[in-house]
Structure formats: structure tokens, C-alpha cells
Amino acid sequence: MNTSPLTVLSVPHDALNFAMPAEACDCHTHVFGPSANYPLSSERNYMPGDALVPDLLALHDGLQIARVVIVHPSPYGTDNACTLDALRLLGPRGRGVAVIDAHTTDAELQAMHKVGVRGIRLNLETSGIHNSDYAATQLRWATARVAPLGWHLQMFTNLSVMASLREVINTLDTPVVFDHFCLARAELGTSQPHFDTLLALLASGRVWLKLSAPHRVAQDPDGAAMTEMARTLIAHRPDRLLWGSDWPHPGGRPGQPRHRDQVEAFNPINDGHALNRLAAWVDDAATLRQILATNPARLYDF
């Protein structure tokens, strides 16, 4: 167990207070930059600073994380160059989730597969898209594109949109992964609208859920409400859960406007503390190993 202090991008991270399982995977990270090499999309809604592969590796080596999933971030639009180059640097340690559009060819998808991409992302929430019909159309289109490759579809959306997609999801053979607790609000508890649908979809085995970025869904990520919601999910279907840090933690600060043309500071999240919190949510080492290592190995084809 490593007890040395760790600081990455000026953010300190606690030492782990548990034994990290072998082949543990951080299933939700982003890489940004160098900004001179990778132009941002003109349609972005924020401007990130640089967060490079060496920074990510410094974090993961310090926290004993052996594997990583790079999720293509929205400021680059459908230009996956930064994510794909990061995967080339990571080699077998890394997997990726890309963002595509109707112009992406099958040959491009095959090339992405070769460097480690294993899914595509529909980022509805960042774009403020909550239209259920649009979401269903996008879901059907996306799964048709990735099914021949054996990939999954990752969605960033909320509980209401997720619930509206239940019938469509039940017709798919492609796994669907929901980011960030599917934005279930911890303070609303496990009886909040549509939380039962999330549990039902998890029980069906058709969807996966990322226990990632609790600061996005709880006023107090260490509080009783967050703990209750997380433990309910873990007890329900631990073989369909993943953990992700959301490093380097984009997303703006609460109450502050976002700017397209001004570098937005990342949230100073302590990822060592986040991992220790996860370990406290879980009752036993076998379940922790399942969430951190076994499940990612299966979904991301490590």
C-alpha cells in the first residue's frame, strides 16, 4: 500500500487506505492537449486547459491503477485525434470511447478499434438535449454502427431520458453504459422518479453504470445520502458497475458560468479520497475487485 504523497496538476491526492486489486481500471478519464496540436471544435461549450498522458500516468501510477479508459471529451467534437493519440501512447494499458457522426466511415471505426476504442459516446447532457424521441433515434443509429464491432454505447444523460429509452434498450444486443450515476440526485434518495427503472435495467443485464463523479450528483459526496444511493446500486447488481475518476474533472464550478473562449479550470478533486470512498461503500474485497478490475476487463476487452 503506497503512503507517499501524490500531487498531479497541482492537486493533492490521498494515499489509498485499502489494497488496490491487480489490473484495476479507471473507466472514465479525459485527455486534453497539447492545445497547440489539437484544435477545439467551434461548437464547444467550454475551453479546457491541458491534461496530458504523462499527467494521467503519474496519477494512476501513484494510485496503483493499471488500466484506463479515455473518454473522448466534447470540446473536440467528433475529431478524435487527441484521444486516439493518447491510446497509442498508452498501448495495451488503455482503451477508448470515441464520438462519431454520420460522416464517420466503417474504415475509420476499424482503425479506431485497432488502437483500443471499444465504444462510442452520446453526450446528451452537456449539450442540454433531453428530448426522448431524439435520444431514441440517436440510440438506434449508434448501436447499429457499433454492433458489428462488438462495442458498447456510452450515454451521458439523466434518469428521465434513461427511463424513456427503456423499451428501446430492451430490444438491443449492444451494451449501454450510463455515466455518472445516470445523474441520479443523491439527496432525492432511492425513491426518486425513475431510479426504479435504473435498477430494473441493471437487473436485466442490458446496461452498465459508472460510479463516477459523485460530486456531480451529491451536495456532499461523503454524506449519508450519497452513501445510501451507492450502496443500493452495489448491492443490486455489482457485476454491472464500473468506477471512473472523471479526471481531470472538467465540468465547471457550481454557480459559475461556462466560457467557450476562456480556459476553464478543472475541479480540484482528490482522486485518492474518491477511491477510498468507493472502498468504504463496498462490503468486501471480492466486490471491490469486481467493480475495479473484473467488470472493466470484460466490457472493454482488456
Model-derived segments and their meaning:
Residues 24-29, 68-71, 94-98, 120-122, ...:
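Hydrophobic faces of well-ordered beta-strands that scaffold small-molecule active sites
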Residues 3-12, 77-160, 167-169, 208-219, ...:
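Active-site gating/metal-coordination segments in enzymes
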Residues 1-78, 261:
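An N-terminally biased module of ancient metal coordination in phosphate/nucleic-acid-related enzymes
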